[in-house]
Amino acid sequence: MTGIEQKTPVGGSETGGADGLYAVLPLRDIVVFPHMIVPLFVGREKSIRALEEVMGVDKQILLATQKNAADDDPAPDAIYEIGTIANVLQLLKLPDGTVKVLVEGTARAKISKFTDREDYHEAYAAALQEPEEDAVEIEALARSVVSDFENYVKLNKKISPEVVGAASQIDDYSKLADTVASHLAIKIPEKQEMLSVLSVRERLEKALSFMEAEISVLQVEKRIRSRVKRQMEKTQREYYLNEQMKAIQKELGDSEDGRDEVAEIEERITKTKLSKEAREKALAELKKLRSMSPMSAEATVVRNYLDWLLSIPWGKKSKVKQDLNFAQEVLDAEHFGLGKVKERIVGYLAVQARSTKIKGPILCLVGPPGVGKTSLARSIAKATGREYVRMSLGGVRDEAEIRGHRRTYIGSMPGKVIQSMKKAKKSNPLFLLDEIDKMGQDFRGDPSSAMLEVLDPEQNATFMDHYLEVEYDLSNVMFVTTANTMNIPGPLLDRMEIIRIAGYTEDEKLEIAKRHLLPKAIKDHALQPKEFSVTEDALRNVIRHYTREAGVRSLEREVMTLARKAVTEILKTKKKSVKITDKNLSDYLGVEKFRFGQIDGEDQVGVVTGLAWTEVGGELLTIEGVMMPGKGRMTVTGNLRDVMKESISAAASYVRSRAIDFGIEPPLFDKRDIHVHVPEGATPKDGPSAGIAMVTAIVSVLTGIPVRKDIAMTGEVTLRGRVLPIGGLKEKLLAALRGGIKKVLIPEENAKDLAEIPDNVKNNLEIVPVSRVGEVLKHTLVRQPEPIEWTEQENPTAVPPVEDEAGASLAH
């Protein structure tokens, strides 16, 4: 690099002449003063290049402290403008790539501007001159500084006593001020302030001020250390420790109003309605506490235990409201629909009004996300007048989260059940256990097994927490749990009363949007009702084309989007109001996300609409089948699991056994391959409920008869052609209604479940119970297949086909 050779000589700038050009070394967490010799460890590439450049041409370098030590590549404005010109005495490269350099500060300098050099920092700077001052005043200050510095070093053990001797021999008072400043334990900005001061008198005054402040702090620290040391020597003597505690209380002014801690705990034990076992345990622990030193670690453990034992509610009950009309009003006002849950709650209150011995029910609300399970629990608490506490079980894997840690462990505490009871402050709250199906288990135990005791009405009256070690009565607690699926261990499931919340119909969603979601959006976005309105047709359009869910969470997000864009439009265009209609809806929400109506526009061969149940509600399931020349292979695709594959095999075997009744020549099976595909290919699918849909698809493919586009179906099929019942009927019917299906075929054994289906679903769908495959094909195929006569030519004594239970409806 030849640019360094063109630098202005440093000598001119030391005398206050024109600016010189210097390589700049930014420093972290250190300020180098003139006359100091300091070792530095340099690791940044720019800094190493600057040092190599200076060493190569034997020039001086400018040391400037950066404002933020964490900044790896500081900008010019992130470096203090006052620095120190220094000579590089020695440079040593270390094995790890860093450099150790020994520098000696010579003079203060002020940076005027940085150059645009990229390989290292470079700047123009001029050495600064010290002003002429009164020598007598400076000498007096210097003597005070040396005296205070001697006291400072005596108190601060980190500084070598030899430094005091060296400082007292310095005749140059400027050098004395800088030497003292470099050894002070003050912050970097304060040291930089000392460097920036040119006046020797001001520097000595600042050094004196900083030292006096530090000496005061160090003296207090010394007194504290001495006092602690004396106290430690007396720890074995209880009398003196107690006297010391009294002395401390007197110093704090608490002696008059303060109360004896043991007496206070004893009074709390007397006033609290503890059980007999808990009272005996509390008194035993109190007796133990009396004999302990108050400062011992064990005393702290006992105090914490007694505090927990006395803080949880013992026999403190909320007055449960028994007004059935009030409860019904609260539940109806905050949640639309959900009649079965409301009926169960009101029924419990009715029985409780007649009998005080009834135990709290343990309800499990099972349903897809967004149907209001968690918020319903809060409404139940309000309707019954109970305190509300919530405990989320999602991801809980440690049994100690439920039962607590034993007191042998440091930092142990009760489990979340007891902690929540303390938070409730009453012994009969409504306790929500959220996401109970999301609990896991690992080497630390199985929390679902620990929940068995909590949720068993026969056992939870004597719930034992590992920390408390006494029985606690949970029988008055009303437990409500929520889950998305029934994926809950059997013994735990058996202890709960399952209430399914299948999801909302379109009309229910519309009412929820009008009663709850729109007013909430208006309130949350600081709108006035007259400023923002959405027509009923627009809301219905949002439900149909922008959401596809069992709950209303996505619907709420879309309504919030409308409100947010309405606020933006009002502020931008100064409109007085925004009205969302069916016509301008797409301007606010964009293109439609979902298609509402039938999946296919025409009747097609081999294309059948089935119905599926998922964790988020029901879905339409398209099943496609094609036939091609081959060797009789059956191919299934669409990420199907074992049960569904077996269902397809059973359907294919059934069709093959009844081939002549469907007008299919048996040799055709050996000459054709059939491929059944279930979109979407990336989504795993399982279950037997698509059996009759598979039979319909295979028969349609082999006969060439199209399937009606407006029919959906669900039901398991047997090898004898019977249609078996399925689960999740309500969710599947809601999915059919959302998809614009006109007719739904369900198993005859599920007809009894129609009583729980909302009337508007039954009124808008033609629901046909079927018990045989023959009945299914009558409804699903555009025309019925004609049976054929067929005999085995190679085997004249062919066994006549066995007529199955569906034969009567198909043959002849």
Swiss-Prot record:
Enzyme Commission designation: 3.4.21.53
Binding-site residues for ATP, renumbered to this chain: 367-374
CDD domains according to UniProt: RecA-like_Lon
Alphabetically ordered keywords of this record: ATP-binding, Cytoplasm, Hydrolase, Nucleotide-binding, Protease, Serine protease, Stress response
GO molecular function: ATP binding; ATP hydrolysis activity; ATP-dependent peptidase activity; sequence-specific DNA binding; serine-type endopeptidase activity
Keyword Transmembrane: no
EC top class, as a word: hydrolase
SMART domains cross-referenced by the UniProt entry: AAA (SM00382), LON (SM00464)
Active site: 689, 732
Gene Ontology terms: biological process: cellular response to heat; protein quality control for misfolded or incompletely synthesized proteins
InterPro entries (UniProt xref): AAA+_ATPase (IPR003593), ATPase_AAA_core (IPR003959), Lon_bac (IPR027543), Lon_bac/euk-typ (IPR004815), Lon_lid (IPR054594), Lon_proteolytic (IPR008269), Lon_Prtase (IPR027065), Lon_prtase_N (IPR003111)
Residues covered by the Lon proteolytic domain: 602-783
Catalytic activity: Hydrolysis of proteins in presence of ATP
Ranges for domain Lon N-terminal: 22-215
HAMAP family given in the database record: lon_bact
Record note on quaternary structure: Homohexamer. Organized in a ring with a central cavity.
Descriptive protein name: Lon protease
Organism of derivation: Brucella suis biovar 1 (strain 1330)
Gene designation: lon
